[in-house]
């Protein structure tokens, strides 16, 4: 709206409606018969989803068949975040270093894996979603790993990724037409705002962000540029974050995130001189 766009909001949850209503008109998508009709009748030009879970909603096909552009990757290109094992295979294909990782179906399977490979593992959800029963649990010893595996929720299984240390950073870039355009480098405070004060078992507490269009730390060069053939093949369009651990003198990719939502979209848009017209051209 700061760039002159007329903004409205589609509500997908039963809470947090006040902030959206202060910006413009709101529409409850749960009671909307046809999202396509709503978009077309309001002459909406662009839809910016706030979560990758939009693609799993009952109105997703309505959105894609509407007259509006969607600022998000679509279809198979979303697997780079959605399916952690897919991301591992993609890195192997394009020679991007990736920690040893395994998918376990249940507790017994997970314990069998760490019996065969007695290392510290980071425990993650294999299918990434804000609603997943498991979020990142960093284990720094084999004992920590075993203890956590006794009490996590195995409804979707678990993704076990070898722990490579604390030297972690992320890099956000725009991908358009198979090309990678660097934006920022960021570092999350996963343990506490002022240093390492315990094991992580949940979302980060905050972070630092540095404008980095020249990729001064080499994160994009190591983890995003090698994937350009795949980005072009799938038509991946939108913001992506590659997060890596610096280990044995190189960056190892630990995950990729499609950067949609309140934590990243406002920052990205404010970095653009003309955000509304730029997004319409992508």
Residue ranges with predicted function:
Residues 280-282:
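Peripheral (often C-terminal) accessory segments that flank ATP-dependent C-N-forming ligase machineries
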Residues 65-136:
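A conserved helix-loop-beta module that forms one wall/lid of the active-site cleft
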Residues 18-21, 37-38, 79-85, 132-133, ...:
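Short, charged, surface-exposed secondary-structure boundary motifs
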Residues 52-54, 126-128, 259:
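Short glycine-rich anion-binding loops that position phosphate/pyrophosphate groups of nucleotides
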Residues 259-277:
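ATP-dependent carboxylate-activation loops
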Residues 1-74, 108:
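ATP-binding N-terminal substructure of ATP-dependent carboxylate-amine bond-forming enzymes
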Residues 43-45, 118, 155:
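Short, high-confidence coil segments that cap the C-terminus of an alpha-helix
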Residues 134-261:
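Internal nucleotide-binding/catalytic subdomain
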């Amino acid at each position: 709206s700061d760039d002159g766009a007329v903004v409205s909001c589609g509500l997908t949850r039963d809470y947090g409606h006040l902030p959206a209503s202060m910006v413009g008109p709101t529409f409850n998508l749960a009671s909307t018969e046809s999202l396509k009709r709503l978009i077309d009748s309001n002459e909406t030009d662009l839809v910016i989803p706030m979560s990758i879970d939009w693609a799993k909603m009952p109105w997703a096909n309505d959105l894609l068949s509407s007259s509006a552009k969607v600022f998000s990757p679509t279809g198979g290109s979303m697997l780079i975040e959605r399916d952690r094992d897919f991301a591992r295979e993609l890195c192997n294909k394009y020679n991007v270093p990736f920690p040893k990782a395994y998918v376990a179906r249940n507790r017994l399977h997970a314990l069998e894996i760490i019996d065969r490979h007695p290392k510290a593992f980071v425990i993650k959800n294999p299918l990434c979603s804000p609603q997943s029963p498991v979020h990142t649990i960093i284990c720094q010893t084999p004992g920590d790993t075993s203890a956590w595996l006794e009490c996590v929720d195995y409804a979707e299984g678990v993704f076990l990724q070898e722990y490579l240390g604390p030297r972690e950073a992320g890099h956000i870039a725009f991908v358009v037409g198979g090309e990678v355009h660097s934006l920022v480098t960021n570092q999350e405070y996963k343990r506490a705002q002022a240093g390492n004060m315990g094991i992580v078992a949940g979302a980060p507490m905050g972070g630092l962000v540095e404008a980095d269009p020249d990729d001064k730390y080499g994160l994009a060069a190591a983890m995003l540029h090698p994937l350009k053939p795949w980005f072009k093949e799938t038509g991946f369009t939108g913001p992506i974050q590659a997060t890596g651990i610096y280990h044995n003198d190189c960056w190892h990719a630990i995950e990729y995130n499609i950067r949609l939502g309140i934590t990243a979209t406002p920052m990205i848009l404010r970095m653009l001189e003309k955000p509304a017209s730029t997004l319409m051209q992508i």
